[in-house]
Amino acid sequence: MPIKIPADLPAYSVLSDEGVMVMSPDQAARQDIRPIKIGLLNLMPKKIQTENQFARLIGATPLQIEFSLIRMTEHQTKNTAAAHMEEFYRPFQEVRDEKFDGLIITGAPIEHLPFEDVTYWQELCEVFEWTQTNVHSTFGVCWGGMAMINYFHGVRKHMLDHKAFGCFRHQNLQPTSPYLRGFSDDFVIPVSRWTEMSQSEIDAAPGLTTLLGSADVGPCLVEDKAHRALYIFNHFEYDSDTLKQEYDRDVASGTEINVPINYYPDDDPSQRPLNRWRSHAHLLYGNWVSEIYQTTPYDVERIGLDTTDLRA
């Protein structure tokens, strides 16, 4: 939560420059409280696992969150019971007239396909356009983030020679970003992908700022202020055993796979993996929800119309 201090107090500008969340009494007086409405467009095969992962992170804040599960309209999932989808999910076409404070677009295990060859690509492009009028802040994750940054900026995804798989060290490139409050300078994030985005292409796209990056696996978290979006290519939301499940699955099927880097103690798969990213995962998603709370209109119907920043 923000600290409320007079705008003319020297600490106000000092803390603001350091990225600390501060709010003047006048700003606080203009800010009412209501539930934050966040949607999850779930493109992953294991729907329930993914729901739990993201709900755990955004539900850990002191704010009340209204969490809505959304699916692509025509795409039929094969890995989750139809009864579950019918009871808890709504198709995009059913929610497109609603407004959301936040939207998370998950990854999908289809990174080997060109974006245009994905069966639901046309509707997903409709979602991207819809976020500009109906969503205050959008968070694209892994393939979902790559798809968004490609759609809005033409940044391409590139196939890797070998799967980036494991827990890789990352660096905090923008310590004063409100999304990185409390972040260490150096930390690990789970990575599991066959594709990457080029830092040079991101740098060449107007309006993009890389917040987190890795010398080993490239850019990780990118801010797109013009489209009120964040794009993350790695997996802070992963459970402690998610990489283990992926590794065990591939070993059992005979698929060639390396032991995930820097995940098991001594890189020994017989040992229990250590979770060394959980605290930063909560920081990132908590900061995202907090930033939504600070900047979204009180009247949900003003989302996409009201560009006033309550901190201005």
Curated annotation (Swiss-Prot):
It catalyses: L-homoserine + acetyl-CoA = O-acetyl-L-homoserine + CoA. Pathway: Amino-acid biosynthesis; L-methionine biosynthesis via de novo pathway; O-acetyl-L-homoserine from L-homoserine: step 1/1. InterPro entries: Class_I_gatase-like (IPR029062), HST_MetA (IPR005697), MetA_family (IPR033752). Its EC number is 2.3.1.31. Its main location: cytoplasm. The record marks 111 as: Important for acyl-CoA specificity. The record marks 192 as: Important for substrate specificity. The active site is at residues 142, 235, 237. The keyword tRNA-binding does not apply. Keywords: Acyltransferase, Amino-acid biosynthesis, Cytoplasm, Methionine biosynthesis, Transferase. GO terms for cellular component: cytoplasm. Coiled coil: none annotated. It is found in: Cytoplasm. GO terms for biological process: L-methionine biosynthetic process from homoserine via O-succinyl-L-homoserine and cystathionine. Substrate binds at residues 163, 192, 249. One of its GO terms (molecular function) is homoserine O-succinyltransferase activity. The keyword Transferase applies. NCBIfam families: metA. Transfers an acetyl group from acetyl-CoA to L-homoserine, forming acetyl-L-homoserine. Belongs to the MetA family. PANTHER family: HOMOSERINE O-SUCCINYLTRANSFERASE. This is Homoserine O-acetyltransferase. It comes from Ruegeria sp. (strain TM1040). The lineage of its organism: Bacteria, Pseudomonadati, Pseudomonadota, Alphaproteobacteria, Rhodobacterales. The gene is metAA.
